[in-house]
Amino acid sequence: MNNSMDKFSNHVRNILHGFFLTIGTTIAEPSTILPLIVNYFGGSSLLVGFFAALLRGGAIVVQLFAAFQAQTYTYMLPYIRRVFFIRFLAWFFIGVSIILFGKESPKLTLFCIGLGLFIFSFSAGFGAIYFKDIIAKIFSPKFRGKTMAYRQFFSALGGLMSGALAAFILESFPAPQSYGYLFIVSSFIMAFGYLAFATVDEPAKTQTMKKENTFKEFLHNSFALLKSDRELQIQLTTFLLAYAYLISLPFIILDAKTKIDLDGIAIGSLITTQMVGAMLSNFLWGRLSGRGYNKLTANISISLYIVAIATAFIASTLQEYMFIFFIIGGAIDGNRIASGNLILALAPQEKRPVYIALQINIISFGLFFSLLGGFLLHFFNYNVLYTITLVMLFISLYFSTKLKEL
Protein backbone atom coordinates (compact mmCIF):
# COMPACT_ATOMS: atom_id res chain seq x y z
CA MET A 1 0.00 0.00 0.00
CA ASN A 2 1.34 3.44 -0.88
CA ASN A 3 1.15 6.74 0.96
CA SER A 4 -1.80 8.19 -0.91
CA MET A 5 -4.12 5.18 -1.23
CA ASP A 6 -5.02 1.93 0.53
CA LYS A 7 -4.11 3.18 4.02
CA PHE A 8 -4.78 0.61 6.72
CA SER A 9 -6.42 3.24 8.95
CA ASN A 10 -8.92 4.09 6.20
CA HIS A 11 -9.50 0.36 5.61
CA VAL A 12 -10.38 -0.10 9.30
CA ARG A 13 -12.64 2.97 9.40
CA ASN A 14 -14.50 1.77 6.31
CA ILE A 15 -15.10 -1.59 7.99
CA LEU A 16 -16.23 0.00 11.28
CA HIS A 17 -18.66 2.23 9.42
CA GLY A 18 -20.28 -0.75 7.74
CA PHE A 19 -20.29 -2.81 10.95
CA PHE A 20 -22.07 -0.28 13.17
CA LEU A 21 -24.35 1.04 10.43
CA THR A 22 -25.61 -2.47 9.70
CA ILE A 23 -26.34 -3.17 13.36
CA GLY A 24 -28.42 0.00 13.43
CA THR A 25 -30.34 -0.29 10.17
CA THR A 26 -31.00 -4.03 10.42
CA ILE A 27 -33.24 -3.21 13.37
CA ALA A 28 -35.83 -2.06 10.80
CA GLU A 29 -34.86 -4.54 8.06
CA PRO A 30 -37.45 -3.99 5.27
CA SER A 31 -37.89 -7.73 4.69
CA THR A 32 -38.59 -8.72 8.31
CA ILE A 33 -39.15 -6.26 11.17
CA LEU A 34 -40.42 -3.21 9.25
CA PRO A 35 -43.37 -5.09 7.67
CA LEU A 36 -44.34 -6.40 11.11
CA ILE A 37 -44.20 -2.90 12.63
CA VAL A 38 -46.35 -1.43 9.87
CA ASN A 39 -48.75 -4.36 10.11
CA TYR A 40 -49.03 -3.90 13.90
CA PHE A 41 -50.23 -0.32 13.49
CA GLY A 42 -52.83 -1.34 10.92
CA GLY A 43 -50.91 -0.57 7.74
CA SER A 44 -51.93 -2.42 4.56
CA SER A 45 -49.66 -4.41 2.23
CA LEU A 46 -49.51 -1.30 0.03
CA LEU A 47 -48.15 0.73 2.95
CA VAL A 48 -45.65 -2.03 3.76
CA GLY A 49 -44.40 -1.79 0.18
CA PHE A 50 -44.31 2.01 0.32
CA PHE A 51 -42.31 2.15 3.55
CA ALA A 52 -39.88 -0.52 2.34
CA ALA A 53 -39.35 1.49 -0.85
CA LEU A 54 -39.01 4.70 1.15
CA LEU A 55 -36.30 3.25 3.37
CA ARG A 56 -34.37 1.81 0.46
CA GLY A 57 -35.00 4.32 -2.31
CA GLY A 58 -36.21 7.64 -0.96
CA ALA A 59 -32.85 9.17 -1.83
CA ILE A 60 -33.10 9.01 -5.60
CA VAL A 61 -34.85 12.35 -6.03
CA VAL A 62 -31.74 14.25 -4.95
CA GLN A 63 -28.94 12.13 -6.41
CA LEU A 64 -28.42 14.12 -9.60
CA PHE A 65 -28.67 17.45 -7.79
CA ALA A 66 -26.06 16.23 -5.29
CA ALA A 67 -23.78 15.25 -8.18
CA PHE A 68 -24.34 18.64 -9.83
CA GLN A 69 -23.12 20.38 -6.68
CA ALA A 70 -20.30 17.91 -6.01
CA GLN A 71 -18.58 18.28 -9.39
CA THR A 72 -16.35 21.06 -8.10
CA TYR A 73 -15.72 19.70 -4.58
CA THR A 74 -12.13 18.72 -3.87
CA TYR A 75 -13.13 17.28 -0.47
CA MET A 76 -16.34 15.39 0.36
CA LEU A 77 -15.88 14.81 4.11
CA PRO A 78 -17.35 18.13 5.34
CA TYR A 79 -20.56 17.37 3.47
CA ILE A 80 -20.91 13.71 4.41
CA ARG A 81 -20.52 14.61 8.09
CA ARG A 82 -23.67 16.75 7.87
CA VAL A 83 -25.50 13.85 6.26
CA PHE A 84 -24.48 11.53 9.10
CA PHE A 85 -25.85 13.91 11.74
CA ILE A 86 -29.22 14.30 9.97
CA ARG A 87 -29.60 10.53 9.55
CA PHE A 88 -28.93 9.95 13.25
CA LEU A 89 -31.63 12.45 14.25
CA ALA A 90 -34.18 10.95 11.83
CA TRP A 91 -33.69 7.39 13.14
CA PHE A 92 -33.87 8.55 16.78
CA PHE A 93 -37.06 10.50 15.98
CA ILE A 94 -38.80 7.34 14.74
CA GLY A 95 -38.12 5.53 18.01
CA VAL A 96 -39.31 8.41 20.18
CA SER A 97 -42.47 8.79 18.07
CA ILE A 98 -43.39 5.12 18.45
CA ILE A 99 -43.04 5.31 22.23
CA LEU A 100 -44.95 8.60 22.54
CA PHE A 101 -47.82 7.93 20.11
CA GLY A 102 -47.82 4.18 19.46
CA LYS A 103 -50.58 3.12 21.83
CA GLU A 104 -52.97 6.02 21.41
CA SER A 105 -52.52 7.18 17.80
CA PRO A 106 -51.54 4.44 15.32
CA LYS A 107 -52.14 6.68 12.29
CA LEU A 108 -49.96 9.46 13.71
CA THR A 109 -47.33 6.85 14.52
CA LEU A 110 -47.34 5.57 10.93
CA PHE A 111 -47.00 9.16 9.69
CA CYS A 112 -44.01 9.77 11.97
CA ILE A 113 -42.38 6.52 10.86
CA GLY A 114 -42.86 7.54 7.23
CA LEU A 115 -41.48 11.04 7.89
CA GLY A 116 -38.44 9.68 9.69
CA LEU A 117 -37.75 7.14 6.95
CA PHE A 118 -38.08 9.86 4.32
CA ILE A 119 -35.56 12.16 6.03
CA PHE A 120 -33.21 9.23 6.71
CA SER A 121 -33.31 8.07 3.09
CA PHE A 122 -33.50 11.54 1.47
CA SER A 123 -30.31 12.65 3.21
CA ALA A 124 -28.62 9.47 1.98
CA GLY A 125 -29.13 10.77 -1.55
CA PHE A 126 -26.38 13.28 -0.88
CA GLY A 127 -24.36 10.88 1.24
CA ALA A 128 -24.15 8.17 -1.43
CA ILE A 129 -22.44 10.53 -3.88
CA TYR A 130 -19.94 11.71 -1.28
CA PHE A 131 -19.31 8.20 0.07
CA LYS A 132 -18.56 6.55 -3.28
CA ASP A 133 -16.31 9.40 -4.37
CA ILE A 134 -14.33 9.13 -1.14
CA ILE A 135 -14.04 5.35 -1.55
CA ALA A 136 -12.72 5.82 -5.10
CA LYS A 137 -10.12 8.32 -3.85
CA ILE A 138 -8.79 6.40 -0.86
CA PHE A 139 -8.65 2.86 -2.33
CA SER A 140 -7.13 1.53 -5.56
CA PRO A 141 -9.41 -0.57 -7.84
CA LYS A 142 -8.14 -4.00 -6.71
CA PHE A 143 -7.89 -3.10 -3.02
CA ARG A 144 -11.36 -1.55 -3.28
CA GLY A 145 -12.86 -4.97 -3.91
CA LYS A 146 -10.95 -6.36 -0.94
CA THR A 147 -11.92 -3.63 1.52
CA MET A 148 -15.58 -3.69 0.47
CA ALA A 149 -15.68 -7.47 0.91
CA TYR A 150 -14.17 -7.06 4.39
CA ARG A 151 -16.68 -4.29 5.07
CA GLN A 152 -19.57 -6.49 4.01
CA PHE A 153 -18.23 -9.45 6.02
CA PHE A 154 -18.14 -7.42 9.23
CA SER A 155 -21.41 -5.73 8.29
CA ALA A 156 -22.96 -9.19 8.17
CA LEU A 157 -21.39 -9.94 11.55
CA GLY A 158 -23.03 -6.76 12.81
CA GLY A 159 -26.29 -8.00 11.34
CA LEU A 160 -25.93 -11.21 13.35
CA MET A 161 -25.56 -9.18 16.52
CA SER A 162 -28.48 -7.02 15.45
CA GLY A 163 -30.68 -10.09 15.01
CA ALA A 164 -29.86 -11.24 18.53
CA LEU A 165 -30.48 -7.73 19.90
CA ALA A 166 -33.79 -7.46 18.05
CA ALA A 167 -34.93 -10.85 19.35
CA PHE A 168 -34.00 -9.87 22.93
CA ILE A 169 -35.85 -6.53 22.81
CA LEU A 170 -38.92 -7.97 21.08
CA GLU A 171 -39.16 -10.75 23.68
CA SER A 172 -38.40 -8.51 26.68
CA PHE A 173 -40.81 -5.63 26.06
CA PRO A 174 -44.40 -5.49 24.80
CA ALA A 175 -45.29 -3.91 21.47
CA PRO A 176 -45.25 -1.07 20.54
CA GLN A 177 -42.68 -0.01 23.17
CA SER A 178 -40.29 -2.69 21.96
CA TYR A 179 -40.35 -1.23 18.44
CA GLY A 180 -39.51 2.22 19.78
CA TYR A 181 -36.62 0.87 21.85
CA LEU A 182 -35.25 -0.87 18.75
CA PHE A 183 -34.92 2.44 16.90
CA ILE A 184 -33.57 4.45 19.84
CA VAL A 185 -30.88 1.94 20.77
CA SER A 186 -29.86 1.38 17.16
CA SER A 187 -29.55 5.12 16.45
CA PHE A 188 -26.72 5.39 18.98
CA ILE A 189 -25.09 2.21 17.69
CA MET A 190 -25.00 3.49 14.10
CA ALA A 191 -23.56 6.79 15.37
CA PHE A 192 -20.30 4.94 16.15
CA GLY A 193 -20.09 3.99 12.48
CA TYR A 194 -20.72 7.56 11.40
CA LEU A 195 -17.92 8.79 13.65
CA ALA A 196 -15.52 6.19 12.22
CA PHE A 197 -16.00 7.13 8.57
CA ALA A 198 -16.13 10.85 9.35
CA THR A 199 -12.45 10.64 10.34
CA VAL A 200 -10.97 8.92 7.26
CA ASP A 201 -7.93 10.53 5.64
CA GLU A 202 -9.36 11.92 2.39
CA PRO A 203 -6.95 13.25 -0.25
CA ALA A 204 -7.90 16.20 -2.43
CA LYS A 205 -9.38 15.41 -5.82
CA THR A 206 -6.87 16.32 -8.53
CA GLN A 207 -9.33 16.50 -11.42
CA THR A 208 -12.70 18.24 -11.25
CA MET A 209 -15.21 19.33 -13.86
CA LYS A 210 -16.34 22.84 -14.53
CA LYS A 211 -19.80 23.19 -13.06
CA GLU A 212 -22.60 23.93 -15.52
CA ASN A 213 -24.39 27.25 -15.18
CA THR A 214 -27.74 25.64 -14.40
CA PHE A 215 -29.04 22.32 -13.11
CA LYS A 216 -31.07 21.99 -16.32
CA GLU A 217 -27.88 22.16 -18.38
CA PHE A 218 -26.31 19.55 -16.10
CA LEU A 219 -29.25 17.18 -16.62
CA HIS A 220 -29.00 17.60 -20.39
CA ASN A 221 -25.28 16.77 -20.35
CA SER A 222 -25.78 13.83 -18.00
CA PHE A 223 -28.38 12.13 -20.15
CA ALA A 224 -26.34 12.84 -23.29
CA LEU A 225 -23.53 10.94 -21.57
CA LEU A 226 -25.92 8.07 -20.81
CA LYS A 227 -27.00 7.86 -24.45
CA SER A 228 -23.40 7.75 -25.69
CA ASP A 229 -22.02 5.09 -23.31
CA ARG A 230 -23.26 1.60 -24.27
CA GLU A 231 -21.45 -0.16 -21.43
CA LEU A 232 -23.09 2.18 -18.92
CA GLN A 233 -26.49 1.32 -20.39
CA ILE A 234 -25.86 -2.42 -19.99
CA GLN A 235 -24.71 -1.97 -16.39
CA LEU A 236 -27.75 0.08 -15.48
CA THR A 237 -30.21 -2.33 -17.11
CA THR A 238 -28.64 -5.34 -15.42
CA PHE A 239 -28.61 -3.95 -11.91
CA LEU A 240 -31.96 -2.18 -12.19
CA LEU A 241 -33.71 -5.44 -13.07
CA ALA A 242 -31.68 -7.30 -10.43
CA TYR A 243 -33.67 -5.33 -7.85
CA ALA A 244 -36.76 -7.25 -8.98
CA TYR A 245 -36.22 -9.49 -5.94
CA LEU A 246 -37.70 -6.61 -3.94
CA ILE A 247 -41.06 -7.19 -5.60
CA SER A 248 -41.37 -10.23 -3.35
CA LEU A 249 -38.91 -9.85 -0.48
CA PRO A 250 -40.90 -7.59 1.91
CA PHE A 251 -43.87 -9.95 1.60
CA ILE A 252 -42.13 -13.30 2.05
CA ILE A 253 -42.19 -12.69 5.81
CA LEU A 254 -45.95 -12.06 5.67
CA ASP A 255 -46.43 -15.24 3.63
CA ALA A 256 -44.39 -17.10 6.24
CA LYS A 257 -46.56 -15.65 9.01
CA THR A 258 -49.57 -17.51 7.57
CA LYS A 259 -47.70 -20.83 7.55
CA ILE A 260 -45.46 -20.87 10.64
CA ASP A 261 -45.39 -19.38 14.14
CA LEU A 262 -43.34 -16.19 13.88
CA ASP A 263 -42.41 -15.24 17.45
CA GLY A 264 -39.52 -12.96 18.37
CA ILE A 265 -37.01 -15.81 18.33
CA ALA A 266 -38.12 -16.96 14.86
CA ILE A 267 -37.88 -13.40 13.50
CA GLY A 268 -34.44 -12.99 15.01
CA SER A 269 -33.44 -16.33 13.46
CA LEU A 270 -34.44 -15.16 9.99
CA ILE A 271 -32.48 -11.92 10.36
CA THR A 272 -29.49 -13.84 11.70
CA THR A 273 -29.66 -16.36 8.87
CA GLN A 274 -29.69 -13.58 6.26
CA MET A 275 -26.64 -12.02 7.85
CA VAL A 276 -24.83 -15.39 8.01
CA GLY A 277 -25.47 -15.81 4.29
CA ALA A 278 -24.11 -12.34 3.64
CA MET A 279 -21.09 -12.86 5.87
CA LEU A 280 -20.02 -16.21 4.44
CA SER A 281 -20.64 -15.14 0.85
CA ASN A 282 -18.10 -12.35 1.17
CA PHE A 283 -15.27 -14.88 1.22
CA LEU A 284 -16.34 -15.69 -2.34
CA TRP A 285 -17.14 -12.11 -3.42
CA GLY A 286 -13.84 -10.78 -2.04
CA ARG A 287 -11.86 -13.46 -3.87
CA LEU A 288 -13.68 -12.89 -7.17
CA SER A 289 -13.66 -9.09 -6.99
CA GLY A 290 -10.03 -8.96 -5.89
CA ARG A 291 -9.17 -10.80 -9.11
CA GLY A 292 -11.34 -8.51 -11.22
CA TYR A 293 -14.19 -10.99 -11.78
CA ASN A 294 -17.02 -8.52 -11.16
CA LYS A 295 -19.10 -9.81 -14.09
CA LEU A 296 -19.03 -13.35 -12.67
CA THR A 297 -19.98 -11.95 -9.27
CA ALA A 298 -23.06 -10.35 -10.84
CA ASN A 299 -23.97 -13.57 -12.69
CA ILE A 300 -23.83 -15.67 -9.52
CA SER A 301 -25.66 -13.10 -7.37
CA ILE A 302 -28.62 -12.77 -9.74
CA SER A 303 -28.81 -16.57 -10.04
CA LEU A 304 -29.03 -16.80 -6.24
CA TYR A 305 -31.97 -14.37 -6.24
CA ILE A 306 -33.73 -16.69 -8.69
CA VAL A 307 -33.12 -19.73 -6.48
CA ALA A 308 -34.45 -17.89 -3.40
CA ILE A 309 -37.67 -16.66 -5.02
CA ALA A 310 -38.31 -20.06 -6.64
CA THR A 311 -38.02 -21.65 -3.18
CA ALA A 312 -40.63 -19.22 -1.80
CA PHE A 313 -43.27 -20.97 -3.93
CA ILE A 314 -42.99 -24.16 -1.87
CA ALA A 315 -41.64 -23.00 1.50
CA SER A 316 -43.74 -24.09 4.49
CA THR A 317 -41.28 -24.52 7.38
CA LEU A 318 -38.99 -22.20 9.33
CA GLN A 319 -35.96 -24.05 7.95
CA GLU A 320 -37.04 -23.42 4.36
CA TYR A 321 -37.56 -19.73 5.05
CA MET A 322 -34.16 -19.60 6.73
CA PHE A 323 -32.68 -21.05 3.52
CA ILE A 324 -34.41 -18.33 1.48
CA PHE A 325 -33.04 -15.52 3.65
CA PHE A 326 -29.59 -17.15 3.72
CA ILE A 327 -29.43 -17.16 -0.09
CA ILE A 328 -30.77 -13.61 -0.36
CA GLY A 329 -28.21 -12.35 2.16
CA GLY A 330 -25.39 -13.62 -0.03
CA ALA A 331 -26.95 -12.36 -3.25
CA ILE A 332 -27.46 -8.82 -1.95
CA ASP A 333 -23.81 -8.45 -0.97
CA GLY A 334 -22.52 -9.92 -4.22
CA ASN A 335 -24.73 -7.67 -6.29
CA ARG A 336 -23.63 -4.62 -4.30
CA ILE A 337 -19.93 -5.35 -4.78
CA ALA A 338 -20.30 -6.06 -8.51
CA SER A 339 -22.33 -2.94 -9.29
CA GLY A 340 -20.17 -0.66 -7.13
CA ASN A 341 -16.87 -1.84 -8.58
CA LEU A 342 -18.03 -1.88 -12.20
CA ILE A 343 -19.30 1.71 -12.14
CA LEU A 344 -16.16 3.07 -10.44
CA ALA A 345 -13.97 1.22 -12.96
CA LEU A 346 -15.98 2.62 -15.86
CA ALA A 347 -16.13 6.27 -14.73
CA PRO A 348 -13.31 8.76 -15.49
CA GLN A 349 -12.17 10.60 -12.33
CA GLU A 350 -13.49 13.99 -13.38
CA LYS A 351 -16.90 12.54 -14.34
CA ARG A 352 -17.18 10.15 -11.39
CA PRO A 353 -19.95 12.01 -9.50
CA VAL A 354 -22.05 12.09 -12.69
CA TYR A 355 -21.57 8.38 -13.41
CA ILE A 356 -22.34 7.51 -9.80
CA ALA A 357 -25.45 9.70 -9.78
CA LEU A 358 -26.73 8.23 -13.04
CA GLN A 359 -26.21 4.72 -11.73
CA ILE A 360 -27.84 5.36 -8.37
CA ASN A 361 -30.73 7.35 -9.84
CA ILE A 362 -31.67 4.81 -12.47
CA ILE A 363 -30.93 1.64 -10.52
CA SER A 364 -32.64 3.03 -7.42
CA PHE A 365 -35.96 3.01 -9.21
CA GLY A 366 -35.70 -0.71 -8.60
CA LEU A 367 -35.88 0.01 -4.89
CA PHE A 368 -39.50 0.96 -5.49
CA PHE A 369 -40.30 -2.48 -6.89
CA SER A 370 -41.75 -3.28 -3.46
CA LEU A 371 -44.58 -0.87 -4.36
CA LEU A 372 -45.35 -3.08 -7.35
CA GLY A 373 -45.19 -6.05 -5.02
CA GLY A 374 -47.70 -4.48 -2.65
CA PHE A 375 -50.03 -3.79 -5.58
CA LEU A 376 -49.74 -7.35 -6.91
CA LEU A 377 -50.37 -8.88 -3.51
CA HIS A 378 -53.31 -6.58 -2.84
CA PHE A 379 -55.09 -7.53 -6.06
CA PHE A 380 -53.74 -11.03 -6.76
CA ASN A 381 -51.82 -13.58 -4.68
CA TYR A 382 -48.35 -14.79 -3.73
CA ASN A 383 -48.00 -17.05 -6.78
CA VAL A 384 -48.49 -14.09 -9.14
CA LEU A 385 -46.09 -12.05 -7.01
CA TYR A 386 -43.33 -14.65 -7.18
CA THR A 387 -43.87 -15.41 -10.88
CA ILE A 388 -43.47 -11.80 -12.03
CA THR A 389 -40.39 -11.48 -9.81
CA LEU A 390 -38.77 -14.50 -11.47
CA VAL A 391 -39.48 -13.26 -15.00
CA MET A 392 -37.73 -9.95 -14.32
CA LEU A 393 -34.79 -11.65 -12.62
CA PHE A 394 -34.23 -13.91 -15.63
CA ILE A 395 -34.13 -10.83 -17.87
CA SER A 396 -31.55 -9.30 -15.52
CA LEU A 397 -29.48 -12.48 -15.69
CA TYR A 398 -29.52 -12.30 -19.50
CA PHE A 399 -28.19 -8.72 -19.51
CA SER A 400 -25.55 -9.61 -16.91
CA THR A 401 -23.98 -11.98 -19.44
CA LYS A 402 -23.32 -8.94 -21.66
CA LEU A 403 -21.35 -7.03 -19.01
CA LYS A 404 -17.66 -6.35 -19.66
CA GLU A 405 -14.90 -6.75 -17.10
CA LEU A 406 -13.12 -3.39 -16.73
Stretches with model-predicted labels:
Residues A124-F139, G334-A347:
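Intracellular juxtamembrane helix-capping segments at the cytosolic ends
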Residues S45-L46, P141-Y150, G264-I265, Q349-Q359:
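Loop-to-transmembrane helix entry/capping segments in MFS-fold secondary transporters
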Residues V62-P78, L170, L280-Y293, L377-H378:
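Helix-to-loop junctions at the C-terminal end of transmembrane segments
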Residues M1-F8, A204-T237:
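Juxtamembrane intracellular "pre-TM" segments in multi-pass secondary transporters
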Residues M1-V61, A66, A70, L77, ...:
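Helix-loop boundary and gating motifs at the non-cytosolic
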Residues P78-V96, L296-T311, L390:
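Structural signature of the two symmetry-related core transmembrane helices
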Residues V96-L115, F313-F325:
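Helix-loop junctions at membrane interfaces in 12-TM secondary transporters
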Residues P35-Y40, F68-T72, G95-E104, G159-Y181, ...:
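Transmembrane alpha-helix termini and helix-breaking/packing motifs in multi-pass membrane transporters
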